């Protein structure tokens, strides 16, 4: 976890500003048009039905559609015949917001490698790699900073999946609200189409089984987007300053997801005045699939 300090159990992020010191390698820039139809497709993929003038909190992930170097898109003319895109374990995702993304604007994305670090865990040596994306408006002002964190583990991604399936389940905590009911493969595909993440492990059943998985599974970012609905239902879009968390377990076809949003009171930093929250998401068996923190203005 990075980008701020802990207040209790909640991380309060610093102001959103582009920072050249946070890149660990070359970056590239490209345009990100925020089109009404694209936002509506994203909304429908996460269970919303009404058009909105602001994009959902995790819509910035859809920059992948416009990134000319994005790797989780089938190569033209060969599909995945030359092998799958690199499949590391997506363990964390973080968004810092200066303001909501507005339908109709065109942003400039700068994308590249961020921080790198290592540690030793129960599954062996772990190498963490951060991908950083900064979105700026036509005035050059920061709008959103997004950080995707992968881990390279000694154990395979499929082996780690089996370990997750073997975890002991707990009773679903009280106060949870349903954010998705009996997720289907169709919804996985809807999200892939809206977000631009076409990794075949999320939609190609035969391929997933050949690579050691029990079935296709939901993109982690779909779980996060569904969780964000519970947060914005409570605090709205305009107040949101940060939203980030860790993926604890995969989500499978047929799962129903429940989220709990807990407010922890006001933050005590003058440059981050607002409220701090934790957000946890569970499946129908009480298994923790995602846990996050958020702050508001």
Which stretches of residues belong to each language-model region?
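Hot-dog-fold acyl-thioester-processing enzymes
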Residues: 6-92, 157-239
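HotDog/MaoC-like acyl-thioester-processing domains
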Residues: 4-22, 27, 92-93, 97-180, ...
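Short, glycine/charge-rich beta-strand/loop segments that flank catalytic centers
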Residues: 54-56, 245-249
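Phosphate-handling active-site elements
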Residues: 119, 233-240, 268-269
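Residue-level signal for alpha-helical context at structural boundaries
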Residues: 129, 206-209, 245
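Mid-chain, well-packed structural core segment of small domains
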Residues: 84, 234-244, 251-253, 259
């Amino acid at each position: 976890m990075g980008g701020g300090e802990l207040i209790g159990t909640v991380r309060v992020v610093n102001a959103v500003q582009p920072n050249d010191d946070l890149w660990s390698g070359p970056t590239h820039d490209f345009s990100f048009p925020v089109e009404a139809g694209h936002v509506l497709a994203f909304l429908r993929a996460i269970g919303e039905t009404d058009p909105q003038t602001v994009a959902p909190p995790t819509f910035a992930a859809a920059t992948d559609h416009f990134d000319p170097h994005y790797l989780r898109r089938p190569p033209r003319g060969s599909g995945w015949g030359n092998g799958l895109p690199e499949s590391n374990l997506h363990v964390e995702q973080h968004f810092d917001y200066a303001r909501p993304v507005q339908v109709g604007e065109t942003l400039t994305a700068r994308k590249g490698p961020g921080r790198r670090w290592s540690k030793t865990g129960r599954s062996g040596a772990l190498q963490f790699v951060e991908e950083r994306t900064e979105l700026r408006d036509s005035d050059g002002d920061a709008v959103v900073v997004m950080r995707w964190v992968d881990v390279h583990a000694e154990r395979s991604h499929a082996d780690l999946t089996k370990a997750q399936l073997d975890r002991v389940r707990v009773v679903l905590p009280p106060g949870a609200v349903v954010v998705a009911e009996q997720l289907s493969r169709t919804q996985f595909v809807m999200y892939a189409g809206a977000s631009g993440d076409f990794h075949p492990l999320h939609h190609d059943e035969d391929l997933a089984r050949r690579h050691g998985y029990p079935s296709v599974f939901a993109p982690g970012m779909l779980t996060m987007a569904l969780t964000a609905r519970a947060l914005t239902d409570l605090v709205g879009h305009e107040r949101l300053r940060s939203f980030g968390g860790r993926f604890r377990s995969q989500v499978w076809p047929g799962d129903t997801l429940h989220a709990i949003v807990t407010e922890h009171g006001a933050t005590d930093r003058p440059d981050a005045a607002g409220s701090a929250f934790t957000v946890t998401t569970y499946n129908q068996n009480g298994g923790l699939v995602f846990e996050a923190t958020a702050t508001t203005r």
